[in-house]
UniProtKB/Swiss-Prot annotation:
Monomer. This is Molybdenum cofactor guanylyltransferase. Its EC number is 2.7.7.77. It comes from Acidiphilium cryptum (strain JF-5). Signal peptide: none annotated.
Length: 196
């Protein structure tokens, strides 16, 4: 169950993608409304959880100014975003966390009461006819099961592991989709202009 005080809840911001549709730009450092996408993500989750970390590939020094731990995928690098979720679960467990909130860095409009609205883990956000598999609450106790899943032959689909642990979808009926992703320059321009 999500702890309303956030003391047993941790968050991992997922920023491991290559940003290919944006020409290889680091999405975490893209500017939207005068702030980086990572600033937006930190602001979204920080009031909901006891601690925040970032899952990102490459040199962690580029994120030093944000003051949060930067997690690496380790031996599961290249197996997709679940490697970042696993790194987040391991970090959360080491810091006394029982539940992990995951949020992609390219989802700047997620609600600041996301964890409370998701309720008990495992839960995933759904809106406007889509399931947003990485906007989710994960039980940290599922880390060993996720490790076995990633040690398997694949495919390493988030939906596959979510089904394995019985993740339930929680509908967000907001008029505007709170889980719009910024994947292209057109998406960024639309977000900047308030069209999404």
């Amino acid at each position: 169950m999500a702890d309303p005080s956030g003391s047993h809840l941790r968050a991992v911001i997922l920023a491991g993608g290559a940003g290919r549709r944006l020409g290889g730009v680091d999405k975490a450092l893209l500017i939207l409304h005068g702030r980086t996408m990572l600033d937006h993500a930190i602001a979204t989750v920080s009031g909901q959880v006891g601690a925040v970390a970032l899952s990102a590939a490459g040199d962690p020094a580029r994120f030093a100014r944000f003051g949060i731990p930067v997690l690496e995928d380790g031996r599961h690098r290249g197996k997709g975003p679940l490697a970042g979720v696993l790194a987040g679960m391991r970090w959360a467990a080491a810091s006394g966390g029982e539940t992990l909130l995951s949020l992609p860095v390219d989802t700047p409009f997620a609600p600041r009461d996301l964890a409370a609205r998701l309720g008990a883990a495992p839960a995933v956000a759904a809106s406007h006819g889509r399931t947003h598999h990485l906007v989710a609450l994960w039980p940290v106790a599922a880390a060993d099961a996720l490790e076995r899943f990633l040690d398997g032959p694949g495919p390493y689909r988030v939906s596959g592991f979510a089904a394995e642990i019985g993740m339930r979808a929680v509908a967000f009926a907001d008029e505007r989709d709170p889980f719009v992703n910024i994947n292209t320059q057109a998406d960024l321009d639309a977000a900047e202009a308030g069209r999404c």
